[in-house]
Amino acid sequence: MSDERDERTGLFILNTGNGKGKTTAALGVLMRAYGRDMKVIMLQFIKRRGSRLGEHLAAEKMGVEIVPLGDGFTWRSDDIEKDRQLARKCWETCQDKILNSDYDLVILDELTYALTYRWLSVDEVLTTIALRPRWMHVVVTGRDAVPALVEAADIVTEMLEIRHSFKKGIPGQIGIEF
């Protein structure tokens, strides 16, 4: 693994936009990296601790780390200060995994929301990503990525919603949405 790391240039990848597929695309990268014997982790900002969604069930079967750190917090919260503090705590965990671990791939799922709502410092996040080991890939997902994040990323993909079954009244489907 060290020889491969010596030859690797870590990428900063951003999946953003209002369409479906940001987390799903990041999970695809996770699968490819894991298949190449890379050490991988996905840290989820909004999904609740103890979540048992499809990706958590699959990760458990495979022995892959997908760690929900949130409590479902959103901008519609009853206690914004509590959510800000939780986002900060989530970020500290992410920062530790980026700076003090030997992961080859770190995915920060739904991080963009914490930046959009100014719960975290964009400069601090970008500095941490810049200070990662040179061989580490970082993927960030979420809607409404702030311009500085878009500018800093090596690869930016914007998911565009053209049509979604929700608008037809079809509820989220097991294995597709969760």
What kind of feature is each model-predicted range?
Residues 1-11:
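Extreme N-terminal, non-catalytic leader segments
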Residues 11-99:
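Conserved P-loop
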Residues 6, 15-17, 24, 138, ...:
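Short glycine- and Lys/Arg-enriched binding-loop motifs that mark or flank ligand-binding interfaces
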Residues 107:
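Glycine-rich phosphate-binding loops of nucleotide-dependent enzymes
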Residues 45, 110-111:
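Generic detector of well-ordered alpha-helical packing
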